[in-house]
Amino acid sequence: MIINAKGPASFAEKYIVRSIWDNKFPPGSILPAERELSELIGVTRTTLREVLQRLARDGWLKIQHGKPTRVNNFWETSGLNILETIADLNPEGFPVLVDQLLSARTNVSAIYFRGALRYNPDTAVDVLAKIHQLEDTAESYAEFDYLLHHTLAFSSGNPLYVLILNGFKGLYSRVGRYYFTSSDARLLALNFYKELELLAQAKNYLDVPALMRTYGMNSGKMWLQLRDDMPASIAQDN
């Protein structure tokens, strides 16, 4: 098992998570005793305890006082905060993970975009006005796209959408910077922003879902053209 880590705690965390992912520690199984596991990994027991507590908070493990530590089925117990970890664990499956991420974000964003234009159209107008000074670079488009989603999610009347977006942030930002290296992708997005701006100015929230569906389909087709050339390094949070 080859693990790149910045310190003992990082190494221990990656070792345990990789072992769970590879079914060395399968769901429902009991982790080795603390002393045995610390010797196996090569870290102090104090460091190991801190790592186990962190992994339990993320849903990988179940820790109960006086009982051995049990491995969870992380698909059932973890949240969006492990997306980065899954991307790092399974680089071969990263393109599929991104497909699923983009599909989920498209479906959810249709709800909070509509809500923002319904309840806070002036906020939507203000943030969309930034497109007229938007630099034609991948970095600028990726940053603005996240800003737009974050602002409209917060203005939708349901701030929980912001928490969902926060779970996507690191992974989506890296993918976005790659996606927007395409001038065609930037033009497609700019046209979408302009149409959305017109709806916001007219306080027309009813037509938002149709616009989102169209852009979702078109950007999805664009992504399929780009994803095969995506650098493998995007899967890693450097």
Swiss-Prot record:
Source organism: Shewanella baltica (strain OS185)
Protein name, entry field: Fatty acid metabolism regulator protein
Role according to the record: Multifunctional regulator of fatty acid metabolism.
Domain of life per record: Bacteria
HTH gntR-type domain sequence ranges: 6-74
Assembly and binders: Homodimer.
SUPFAM superfamilies recorded: GntR ligand-binding domain-like (SSF48008), Winged helix' DNA-binding domain (SSF46785)
Subcellular locations according to the entry: Cytoplasm
Gene Ontology molecular function: DNA binding; DNA-binding transcription factor activity; fatty-acyl-CoA binding
CDD domains membership: WHTH_GntR
Phylogenetic classification of the source organism: Bacteria, Pseudomonadati, Pseudomonadota, Gammaproteobacteria, Alteromonadales
Gene: fadR
Pfam families documented for this protein: FadR_C, GntR
Entry's Gene Ontology BP terms: fatty acid metabolic process; regulation of fatty acid metabolic process
GO CC entries: cytoplasm
DNA-binding segment(s): 34-53
Keywords: Activator, Cytoplasm, DNA-binding, Fatty acid metabolism, Lipid metabolism, Repressor, Transcription, Transcription regulation
